[in-house]
Amino acid sequence: MLSIVGSSGAGKTTVCKAVMGLLSSNYSISGEVLYRGENLLHCSKKRLQAIYGKEICYIMQNPMTAFNPSLRIGRQLEKTCYLHNPQISRQELQLLVSNTLQQLGLDDLKRILKSYPDALSGGMLQRIMIAAALINQPTILVADEATTAIDACNRIELMQLLRQLCSGGMAILFVTHDLRAASMADRILIMNDGQLVEAGTTEQIFNEPKEEYTKYLLSACTLERR
């Protein structure tokens, strides 16, 4: 797991969108986005459609932008899965949707699946959005502030789930403004004002920070704990 940490406006979400190919043509992107030897910046639209949503999935910062307000949650999750698994049976599809939601601690399945997005809380929508990203069992998960709208108890459970997914072979890019949440990552990148200012293992960042901005973020964590 790789975590990108920085305050609001540091450029974290822009990095996520660049990785996912979601930046508008107003942006100029240099470098490479490599996935299994392919530079995604140079792939065809057809190839990208096969990769994004199936092999590389994105958890957006705002759950309300991820759902169609006119479709029930159950239908949206089924369409997300069926798009990349058209051979799946109806029974398998329903079971996969139910199991994925329960994995995120969502047990009131009947109500959730029949609900429209605006009938659910922000925290519940956040977890459903995470379920939508996990339903196709991606190899890479890009999570932009995935724990922000979730209460403390469910946040801990989600972070534990992310670690379990990593142990199972999934790679995760975990974006957060909170260094404490980033402590579960293997490596951390610190961003400030659109620039990468420090990178290292989690132990190095927490125990041997080199940059003043990193030290500032660490001191902010200490103050919050008090």
Where is each model-derived feature located?
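Conserved ABC transporter NBD signature motif
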Residues: S28-N39
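C-terminal boundary and immediately downstream tail of ABC-type ATPase nucleotide-binding domains
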Residues: I56-Y58, D107, N207-R226
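Conserved ABC ATPase signature
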Residues: S115-L120, M124
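A short, proline-enriched helix->beta-strand linker immediately N-terminal to the Walker B motif
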Residues: I135-T139
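Conserved catalytic segment of ABC-fold P-loop ATPases
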Residues: M184-I190
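ABC ATPase "signature
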Residues: A199-G200, E208
